[in-house]
Swiss-Prot record:
<dbReference type="Pfam" id="PF01667">
    <property type="entry name" value="Ribosomal_S27e"/>
</dbReference>
<dbReference type="GO" id="GO:0003735">
    <property type="term" value="F:structural constituent of ribosome"/>
</dbReference>
<dbReference type="GO" id="GO:0003723">
    <property type="term" value="F:RNA binding"/>
</dbReference>
<dbReference type="GO" id="GO:0008270">
    <property type="term" value="F:zinc ion binding"/>
</dbReference>
<feature type="zinc finger region" description="C4-type">
    <location>
        <begin position="37"/>
        <end position="59"/>
    </location>
</feature>
<dbReference type="InterPro" id="IPR011332">
    <property type="entry name" value="Ribosomal_zn-bd"/>
</dbReference>
<dbReference type="GO" id="GO:0000479">
    <property type="term" value="P:endonucleolytic cleavage of tricistronic rRNA transcript (SSU-rRNA, 5.8S rRNA, LSU-rRNA)"/>
</dbReference>
<comment type="similarity">
    <text>Belongs to the eukaryotic ribosomal protein eS27 family.</text>
</comment>
<keyword id="KW-0862">Zinc</keyword>
<dbReference type="GO" id="GO:0006412">
    <property type="term" value="P:translation"/>
</dbReference>
<dbReference type="GO" id="GO:0000462">
    <property type="term" value="P:maturation of SSU-rRNA from tricistronic rRNA transcript (SSU-rRNA, 5.8S rRNA, LSU-rRNA)"/>
</dbReference>
<keyword id="KW-0863">Zinc-finger</keyword>
<dbReference type="GO" id="GO:0022627">
    <property type="term" value="C:cytosolic small ribosomal subunit"/>
</dbReference>
<protein>
    <recommendedName>
        <fullName>Small ribosomal subunit protein eS27B</fullName>
    </recommendedName>
</protein>
<comment type="function">
    <text>Component of the ribosome, a large ribonucleoprotein complex responsible for the synthesis of proteins in the cell. The small ribosomal subunit (SSU) binds messenger RNAs (mRNAs) and translates the encoded message by selecting cognate aminoacyl-transfer RNA (tRNA) molecules. The large subunit (LSU) contains the ribosomal catalytic site termed the peptidyl transferase center (PTC), which catalyzes the formation of peptide bonds, thereby polymerizing the amino acids delivered by tRNAs into a polypeptide chain.</text>
</comment>
<dbReference type="InterPro" id="IPR000592">
    <property type="entry name" value="Ribosomal_eS27"/>
</dbReference>
<comment type="subunit">
    <text>Component of the small ribosomal subunit (SSU). Mature yeast ribosomes consist of a small (40S) and a large (60S) subunit. The 40S small subunit contains 1 molecule of ribosomal RNA (18S rRNA) and 33 different proteins (encoded by 57 genes). The large 60S subunit contains 3 rRNA molecules (25S, 5.8S and 5S rRNA) and 46 different proteins (encoded by 81 genes).</text>
</comment>
Length: 82
């Protein structure tokens, strides 16, 4: 009997579809972001799955709002993944 799937060397596409704990190497899917405020250009570090609304420290503009999973960035904000 020949195996159709190689279990020791899975493809990147099949690993991306799996649950984070079912992959060959376990790891989180969350990350931190550097978000730039569109008004004052101040940079704030935000968690990707933030559960509270994050505001800019200097001008009090809302940078992201929480959803059920990932936080939704506000219109006009630019970001960079850390």
């Amino acid at each position: 009997m020949v195996l159709v799937q190689d279990l020791l060397h899975p493809t990147a596409a099949s690993e991306a579809r799996k649950h984070k704990l079912k992959t060959l190497v376990q790891g989180p899917r969350s990350y931190f972001l550097d978000v730039k405020c569109p008004g004052c250009l101040n940079i704030t570090t935000v968690f990707s799955h933030a559960q509270t609304a994050v505001t800019c420290e200097s001008c009090s503009t809302v940078l992201c709002t929480p959803t059920g999973g990932k936080a939704k960035l506000s219109e006009g904000t630019s970001f960079r993944r850390k």
